[in-house]
């Protein structure tokens, strides 16, 4: 599918015009958007626009890292959008010349449609030229990162609040799922941040105060997003470590309980074993108070060991 928007030298907005119309002398500049194009449409990149073969190849090689390449008469941007359902990265390619902007994306990208709607609602924006359209597309796609980042942050807070009511295994699975999502975000945001830094380093951007202000705004957004993502990754690490520590403490408490019980019953088992032997000549077996004496000895041993455990601080682990 191809959507073509153009503005005439008299600042008239033209929508959904045929590709041949953009060559007319009354066209000031135009925007051609290729969305899920067919073979005959993608051939226009080569036959109509005469873009460099390497740039055309990059359009079909998923996924290219966000970048900026300079060609004769135009710049080629590779930027990334995020699928709000799967957090998968989707590539958007921008060819920007003096009189045109050509966008290319294999999948539906709501951000592109929103930019087009803004242009239709405020045609005066088109007077700012094709460079401003490139800025608007980047700005829209980056702004759409924020709800995804905040959604993960909310999920992280929910996990923190529900920690006392969930099992260790459930919590760990949720934390690792969040870390995976944060990794996807980081792999998108950091390269985009590097791209914007490079754009701000261009001579023509440095010389144009308004253009620099626009792209600086996107760069600031990406800095904020990267800080939030890194902070959330640190929080998931802290949660993971606290869960591991908590589980280790629980295991230590269990092992201590078993150790105390075993330690208590070892001498009791020994005494019971001695007097359970079937010898005929054991003086205590025929003693009138032998049974009570053995029980008393066992009780004294239990009480003595418990006092010794308390003195050594063995029960502190249960506090």
UniProtKB/Swiss-Prot annotation:
The chain crosses the membrane at residues 254-274, 290-310. Keywords: Cell membrane, Membrane, Transmembrane, Transmembrane helix, Transport. This is Putative metal ion transporter YfjQ. Coiled coil: none annotated. It is found in: Cell membrane. GO terms for molecular function: cobalt ion binding; cobalt ion transmembrane transporter activity; magnesium ion binding; magnesium ion transmembrane transporter activity. The gene is yfjQ. NCBIfam families: corA (TIGR00383). GO terms for cellular component: plasma membrane.
